Amino acid sequence: CALEYGCLEAQNLFLKRWEAPLPTSRSCNAQCFGCISKQNGPVLANHERLAFVPTPQEVFEVTDLHFSRVENPVASFGQGCAGEPLTQWKVLLESVELIRKKYSKGTINLNTNASIPEAVEMLCNAGLSSMRVSIASPTRELYDRYHNPIGYSFDDVLDSLRVAKRMGKFISLNLLVFPGLTDRQDEFANLLEFLDEYDIDMIQWRNLNIDPEQYMGLMGTGPMGDGLMAVIEKLKTLKPQLRHGYFNPFVG
């Protein structure tokens, strides 16, 4: 992963720094239009999907290695080479419990679609530190078009955000941004309302590498927006406490 694929998080593990990866799931309960680890038909995915589910002990051993030798370490469930980690929530739960038996500090993060609020609550109780939730849009209809949820709904995502926030966890949005959609005035208004409603701590601005004609054909066109930099600058003015970045931070 570190040498052939050039995965930055895999490199972090070997270079003893920052955020280490914890891929755990082979399956997913969404069919995102731009999935980077699994595609149907002739289109090739960027990554090969994880071929096995690790045991909690294996997850602990990787985390133990990273936490024992890195200052301000982060370990994250949910990677581009894997499916949705919450589909393996029992493995995650036991893994977090094992980690917290040895380490009271060190950030355990969950990159997720936040589809199972009951599992999110159990993980938070066990010692999860932070959660990064992926959305292509805060608008329900557009969310459904892109993510194609299977067996869950946008309401479940919102419930997970409420649960994690109520329990004092650090919440990031993994916002899949695309000029012509994210910067539209109606989308910005919905994003601002979303940030206020769920008290989001951080936006990770994830530039969506996708065919523009296919994407806008799926999501629909609208009035020309103000540009992504204008959106970011407006948010910095309106919500100065909101953090902006691209990677998961250490939160304790």
Label every PLM stretch briefly.
Residues 1, 189-252:
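Auxiliary Fe-S-binding modules of radical SAM enzymes
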Residues 1-22, 39-46, 65, 250:
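N-terminal [4Fe-4S]-dependent radical SAM core
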Residues 19, 39-94, 98-119, 126-157, ...:
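Core AdoMet radical
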Residues 23-40:
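Local cysteine-cluster metal-coordination motifs and their immediate loop/turn environment
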Residues 80-82, 113-115, 136-138, 176-178, ...:
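Active-site beta-loop-alpha junctions enriched in small/polar residues
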Residues 89-105, 154-169, 222-246:
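Alpha-helix-loop-beta-strand connector modules within alpha/beta enzyme cores
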Residues 118-123, 180-197:
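Catalytic cores of alpha/beta
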Residues 148-150, 160-187:
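Conserved strand-turn element in the central/C-terminal portion of the radical SAM core barrel
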